[in-house]
Amino acid sequence: MPGKHQHFQEPEVGCCGKYFLFGFNIVFWVLGALFLAIGLWAWSEKGVLSNISALTDLGGLDPVWLFVVVGGVMSVLGFAGCIGALRENTFLLKFFSVFLGLIFFLELATGILAFVFKDWIRDQLNLFINNNVKAYRDDIDLQNLIDFAQEYWSCCGARGPNDWNLNIYFNCTDLNPSRERCGVPFSCCVRDPAEDVLNTQCGYDVRLKLELEQQGFIHTKGCVGQFEKWLQDNLIVVAGVFVGIALLQIFGICLAQNLVSDIKAVKANW
């Protein structure tokens, strides 16, 4: 009986998963570098890079922080995933998986805690907005962010227009020499659809009027309440976005771990 030769297929690294992970992460890397570059450029324009103490001088949130932090995290993750997949480097791939997994669990924990301690979150959001109201004129990026939020959610202040008493330019004290005294920023104003030119002085002296009179000129609802209402109205969309991000993260972790297993299997046959 003639002898039969058995041929065993040697394990190999899956090219499809490898180059998909590489392509996905190179896009991630480029976007991260772009975010980081925008953040650093903005800081350079504001003189922060030449005076690091300016980072702590601002009473509210500097929106540029968001670009720098998000850009930095995306760049690190993109680099690890991209080079790890291309060079079949198990250390970088494991780093990518662990880092991405850590971010996933932090997001999950944040979501659970936000649901359980929603009253505390509401109080913190109120405090956060009021701190930024105080620093409204201190930074142009912060000013633009607050104006955008108040216009988008048709609100004024954290709980209402009187929160602008916290700002030295808008407070109603007799010692305030500002022309904006007892007023609110233009972003609080109820816009006239027929108005072609934005009236930036529409909020002047408006808080000297009675509350019922104010409603014809400015939005009297607070941004905390309006933000909560927006979340409830768009719950399906918001939940869909977060679920999509979570699934993408899980897919990236599984893809990286599968690639690590393939690389180890190939090395075991050397």
From Swiss-Prot:
Q: What is the protein's major site of localization?
A: membrane
Q: What is this protein called?
A: Tetraspanin-17
Q: Which GO terms describe its biological process?
A: regulation of membrane protein ectodomain proteolysis
Q: According to its UniProt entry, what is the function of this protein?
A: Part of TspanC8 subgroup, composed of 6 members that interact with the transmembrane metalloprotease ADAM10. This interaction is required for ADAM10 exit from the endoplasmic reticulum and for enzymatic maturation and trafficking to the cell surface as well as substrate specificity. Different TspanC8/ADAM10 complexes have distinct substrates. Seems to regulate VE-cadherin expression in endothelial cells probably through interaction with ADAM10, promoting leukocyte transmigration.
Which positions, given as ranges, span the membrane? 20-40, 64-84, 95-115, 235-255
| GO cellular component term, pick one | plasma membrane
Q: Where in the cell is it found?
A: Cell membrane
Extracellular side of the membrane: what ranges? 41-63, 116-234
Xref: Pfam families: Tetraspanin
- Summary of subunit composition and partner proteins: Interacts with ADAM10; the interaction influences ADAM10 substrate specificity, endocytosis and turnover.
Q: What ranges does the Cytoplasmic topological domain annotation cover?
A: 1-19, 85-94, 256-270
The way it spans or sits in the membrane comes to:
Multi-pass membrane protein
Which sites carry carbohydrate?
Answer: N51, N171
Alphabetically ordered keywords of this record: Cell membrane, Disulfide bond, Glycoprotein, Membrane, Transmembrane, Transmembrane helix
Q: Which family does it belong to?
A: Belongs to the tetraspanin (TM4SF) family.
| S-S bonds | C155-C223, C156-C188, C172-C182, C189-C202
